[in-house]
Amino acid sequence: MVNSMIPWIGGKRLMREFLIARFPPYYDKYVEVFGGAGWVLFAKKPERFEVYNDANSNLTNMFHVVKHKPMSFVKELGFLPLNSRAEFDLMLDWHRKQDFSLPYQTEEMALAKIYLSPIDFREYKELITTQAELGDVRRAATFYKLIRYSYAAGGNSFNGQPVNIAQTYRTIWLANRRLNENGVKSDSEILMAGGNPGKGVIIQNKSFEVIIALYDSPTTFFYLDPPYFGTEKQYEELFTLELHYLLREVLGKIEGFFMLSYNDCEFIRELYKDFYITPFERLNSISQKYTPGGMFKELVITNYDPELRLKSQPKQLTLL
């Protein structure tokens, strides 16, 4: 079991074992629709066809960089943690402007091809491409620091905490290994993967209805952890009431299996009353400072019997 490399709003660290134990007994494609920090993905056993998706492009860019450019990512992080609110605010302002690569790159390349010799153009193209790639890395490192040093991993308010650098880098390397761990895909699977060939977890940046339509099949298993009802403003990507209804409509029509985690409230219970609903209670990690021992109630919703996997496991015989 591998830990996620970042904390995250609504992360499933405390629920991951409960959830994994209730996966369907059989499926051949695993898709995380609202990937977030990927706590469930990192905790589950690697499988041959896995997809990490999130509508937040900062998250998916960071996952892509950790998977494909870990050395550059670690180098960009450096050994200098943020020590003040002023440093955090400066980085937050820079990140919001999304100024991570050279402006007018396409126009520059077109003009260079006209006015430079072939040899000079190749050298110039390599330089520009390298700088653009570093822009992705810089963006990923900045986003990582914002999440790591913000209150409740929200990325908006400073909450500096001591950092174990060795442990941080070890977690990043383990994440890199996990994202590259599963099997090489066949030509047909690469086509289904949306043109993402090769070994490892497929990383996508799409809306939930698009990603579900792309991968749905009778043997696909979707795990979904959407913004919880009533807490949508805590997330960078807006999730409206209409989207909660749309998610229910989409899930009601799929061919595959789904597992959905939500906060326990009457609205969600009524919305998904036609499916299996399993309650779960965990420590409320955000409120522990003010209400020690406070609990948070959640729901696990599935379109299959969530006890099937548990029932299918062999029971240990005893002589007592």
PLM regions and their residue ranges:
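S-adenosyl-L-methionine
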Residues: 1-35, 39-40
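Conserved S-adenosyl-L-methionine
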Residues: 25-85
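Long, positively charged, glycine-interspersed low-complexity recognition regions
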Residues: 229-231, 236-320
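Short active-site oxyanion
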Residues: 26-30, 48-49, 196-202, 252-258
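Short, solvent-exposed loop/turn segments at secondary-structure junctions
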Residues: 37-40, 56-59, 149-152, 208-211, ...
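SAM-dependent nucleic-acid methyltransferase catalytic core
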Residues: 1-7, 11-15, 70-223, 227-232, ...
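Short loop/helix-cap segments at secondary-structure boundaries that form the rim of catalytic
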Residues: 41-46, 214-217, 267-274
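Conserved beta-strand scaffold positions in the cores of enzyme catalytic domains, especially
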Residues: 50-52, 203, 277-279
